[in-house]
Every structure is written in structure tokens, then in C-alpha cells.
Amino acid sequence: MTKYVFVTGGVVSSLGKGIAAASLAAILESRGLKVTLLKLDPYINVDPGTMSPFQHGEVFVTEDGAETDLDLGHYERFISTKMRKANNFTTGQIYESVIRKERRGDYLGKTVQVIPHITNEIQAFIERGAASATCGEPDVAIVEIGGTVGDIESLPFLEAARQMSLRLGRNSACFVHLTLVPYVATAGELKTKPTQHSVQKLREIGILPHVLLCRADRRIPDDESKKISMFSNVPEDAVISVWDADSIYKIPQMLHDQGLDRIICEELKLSPKDADLTMWSELVEKLENPKHEVTIGMVGKYVDLTESYKSLIEALRHASLHTSTKVNIEYIDSEEIETNGVDSLKHLDAVLVPGGFGRRGTEGKIAAIRYAREAKVPYLGICLGMQLAVIEFARNVVGLKQANSTEFEPDTPERVVALITEWYDRDGKVETRTEESDLGGTMRLGSQRCPIKPGTMAEEIYGKDVNERHRHRYEVNNRFVPQLEAGGLIISARTPSEDLPEMMELPRSMHPWFVGVQFHPEFTSTPRDGHPLFKSFVEAALANKQARGV
């Protein structure tokens, strides 16, 4: 039978519940347990697909095509279990399901209320998510509840967790509470009152945490831990200090050294083998002792909030691990390039243009791509970055001066990138979409395997085929491909069913390393294995730096 660990947060958001939950999962997995994770988001949106990256951060896409919270990316990077749509749900999905049942008559005329109907539905979603784990029936399901204790939006989720713990019985569920212990510089000390009040809030709704994870900018002294223990009614050894680290991959060892996994296993009456965190210590060793160093420029419009590119940043870090190369990322605002030109790019070893939506900043990205192509600087374009690379090539090499995407210029005569009007859904039916279709849930999403053209750089990187995740509604227009290929551009991978361009590259006779991909390879990169595309990109950046004698 699956046992549950509920992870809650207090005082403020963005303390790192997702990293803490993923780190605990990594330790338990190293002890031989089958582990899955779920993220419960209290917002009313059905999914984060149409939310601004400035508000929500990155949207992580699962293999089965779900648009989910970025914490699911952390989960996949820390454990071997792949996430699915059922691993993330929102208040919007819960209410949508309950209202659908009410309309269908499932409640037999009863008054539908938050308790019991909403809370019962939350419990059903949790158990369904755990049961659908790709690892088989998990020994432990770690459930991260978004928001903070005291938020009105989180109350139904906390109440559902309390009810579920009571229903499952002793030693079947436990609670881990992550809270802030701020350092007040004027007083010269850590303050425990916010943590005490946060735990009191939790106890008011009937939840007594078994473990406190105390976030601070430094290790919490023993006397402060004793104070927290006494006022929170949590055993002293279960008050665990979680201080700022320069790498998230140090957190599993930090938590294990303080006995978090032992406490959880004792509470849930589990007797697994001892933890083996050798892999994590080796990763940290590689991170801290690189042999080389490169600087890669990431040109985008969300550069002020790096959470928007969380998986991409981590994928570059993974590549640094597997190439013994420290990767410095410079975030460059594409709108500044539109104003000031490309001088800010001239010291870079490589240029990367990530995915994005909307017209703002696109001409700056195109200028950056042109610079990378003409200066022979390694270039990687992801999703929109590939589309803009094709537009740049069409304008400046092929001579299609009005080449553009209908996303930015609906009336452009040279629609090099256009909306895919006919899509195949998962049942194989054709669905026609237009520019007026709803935005939510209307993208090409999830994994798709594609054959790769022999003799290309793509084949050197991936092999005979590529299986990556997608999130887009625009594609390179096949009508212009013959002209692009006549100019030298290579379409190196296509979808087998719709024949859509998936990868493009320039031959080495034109450029040493210039690749665009319509998919999002960053979603499948892990610290354990890295990713072949990002490893090749970092190696190309290093070769460029060495060739320049820098």
C-alpha cells in the first residue's frame, strides 16, 4: 500500500518546497523505495498553459502532453520516475470535475459544498495520481501543496490532506512543513517567531507536522532549534536546518545528514536499505571542479526572471557536468539589442535563443541570430528560436525580405512560419484550428518520435531518431522549405505523420555549429545523464573559445 508524505509551506512562498520534496524523494529512491511526487496548485486556472511566465515561471511539459508547474521538472531531474498529467492538478481542475458531476446528477440532488465534495475530489485526485505512477505502485507518494498555510486558496487542500491522513490511519501518512527562519541584521540574530506562528496556523486546522524544514540563509544553531522544537511541539531531531546552498544538488546530502529520511521511514514504518548518495556527491564534485569555462548568451524577453527558463538553465548545468566545463549564462534582453545593436554579443562563446510567445523582442532575437550565423558563433534555437532562425535565413540568405511568422504579422505575404491549421488529437482525429481558436489547451504538446536525416549533425548528436517534448502552435511552413534548402539550410528531422519540420541546421561548410529544434530538449535533461544536444552545444562553445585563443 502506498504511503503519503504531505509537504506544506509557511510564512512566505518560494522557499523551495519543490526542491525539498524532490530531494527527499531522491534520498528515498536511493534507499530502494519506489517514489512518485504530486504537486497541488491552489490557483483556479485549469493549468498554467496561458499564464504569464512573469507570474508563474516556466511551464513544464510532461511526456503525455500536460502543461504543468515547473516543480515537476525538479521532480524528474531528481528521481527516475517520469511525471504525467495526473501528477499535477489545480483548484480549477477540481471544481471543473465537481461541477461536471453535479450537472450529470452524480450527487443525487444534494447541496454541493467544499466539505465533503471538494475535499473528497481532492483526495480522489491524489490517490489517482499516485496510482498512475510510471514506476508501478509506489511505496511513497510525496504530495507538495502549493501556497502557504493561512492562504484562503490552500485551505481545501490542507483539509483534504488532514482527512486523508485520518482515513488512512497511523503510520500511513506524515506531514513535513517548510518554513522561514529569517535573519534580522539589525538584531544580529535569527528569528523563530514566524515559524512558531506558521505551525500554530497548521495546528489550528488539525495538522501537527512530524518534521519542520527551517529555511534560513545560514545553519540554524542548536539553541534556536530547541526553541522551535519546544514551541512547535515537534521533536528536536525533527527540526531540520535547510540553509542556502550554491547548488540545489547539495540538498539531498544536506537533508540526509540531518536524518530526514530516517525520520520519515520510522514514521511510516518502512525498513528500506541504507541510502547511497554517491551519485549526488560525484555530481557536486564535478560542478565544483570544472576543467574549462565558457560564456553562453541567452537572448530572450523574460531575462529579468530566470524562473521562466528553469529547465533550460538546468540543462546547461547538466551539460557542464558532463563536459567538465563551467557554463556562465549571460541573460540578454532582446529589446535592448533592437535599440543598441549586437555589440553585447561579441564576447560570447555561443548564443542561445529559447522558446517564447508574442511579437515583442523578436527583431532583436533575429538580429542576434544573424550575428551568430555571420560571425560563425555556435547557435542553438529552441522552439521560437528555431522559427526565428528560419526567418532570419529566409530574409538574409534566400532573399525573402518580408519573411515572417503569422504570429507576429498575420498578413505577411511570405509566411515562412505559420499556424498549423490541422492537428491530430490523441485519438487520431483531425481538429481544425484558426487564429480565433481558444488559446488554452490548443498547442501541440507532449513527446513525439521522429526519424533523423542520415549524414546530418542531428544524426551525430541523436542517432537515427529523436524523441522529445513539444509545446507550440506555429511551425515552419513546408511551402517555403524548397527555397530554404536551395539556399543551403538543411531540415534534418521531420514528424512521420504530419511531415512537419522538427530540426534544422546549417552544413559545416556554412557554419561550424548552427542548430534549431522545434521541440524542447531541456525537459528531458537530467543531472544523471545530461542531454546529447546540450553537451554538443557546450562542446561547440568551448571549441569556438579555444579557436579564438581567448
UniProtKB/Swiss-Prot annotation:
Domain of life of the organism in this record?
A: Bacteria
Q: How is its activity regulated?
A: Allosterically activated by GTP, when glutamine is the substrate; GTP has no effect on the reaction when ammonia is the substrate. The allosteric effector GTP functions by stabilizing the protein conformation that binds the tetrahedral intermediate(s) formed during glutamine hydrolysis. Inhibited by the product CTP, via allosteric rather than competitive inhibition.
Say yes or no: keyword Metal-binding present. yes
Specify one Pfam family.
GATase
Where does this protein have coiled-coil stretches? none
Biological process terms from the Gene Ontology for this record are: 'de novo' CTP biosynthetic process; pyrimidine nucleobase biosynthetic process
Alphabetical keyword list:
ATP-binding, Glutamine amidotransferase, Ligase, Magnesium, Metal-binding, Nucleotide-binding, Pyrimidine biosynthesis
UniProt keyword annotation of Ribosomal protein present: no
Q: Where does Mg(2+) bind?
A: D71, E144
Q: Which GO terms describe its cellular component?
A: cytosol
Chain positions recorded as CTP binding sites:
S13, D151, I152, E153, K191, T192, K193, P194, T195, Q196, K227
* Binding residues annotated for L-glutamine, in chain numbering: G356, L384, G385, M386, Q387, E407, R473
Q: Which residues form the Glutamine amidotransferase type-1 domain?
A: 295-547
- Region named Amidoligase domain: 1-270
Instruction: Please state the pathway this protein functions in, per its UniProt record.
Output: Pyrimidine metabolism; CTP biosynthesis via de novo pathway; CTP from UDP: step 2/2
- The active site consists of C383 (nucleophile), H520, E522
Binding, UTP: S13, K191, T192, K193, P194, T195, Q196, K227
Q: Which NCBIfam families match?
A: PRK05380.1, PyrG
Any idea what job this protein has?
Catalyzes the ATP-dependent amination of UTP to CTP with either L-glutamine or ammonia as the source of nitrogen. Regulates intracellular CTP levels through interactions with the four ribonucleotide triphosphates.
Cite any additional comment in the entry. Answer: CTPSs have evolved a hybrid strategy for distinguishing between UTP and CTP. The overlapping regions of the product feedback inhibitory and substrate sites recognize a common feature in both compounds, the triphosphate moiety. To differentiate isosteric substrate and product pyrimidine rings, an additional pocket far from the expected kinase/ligase catalytic site, specifically recognizes the cytosine and ribose portions of the product inhibitor.
Describe the protein's quaternary organization and the partners it interacts with: Homotetramer.
Q: What is this protein called?
A: CTP synthase
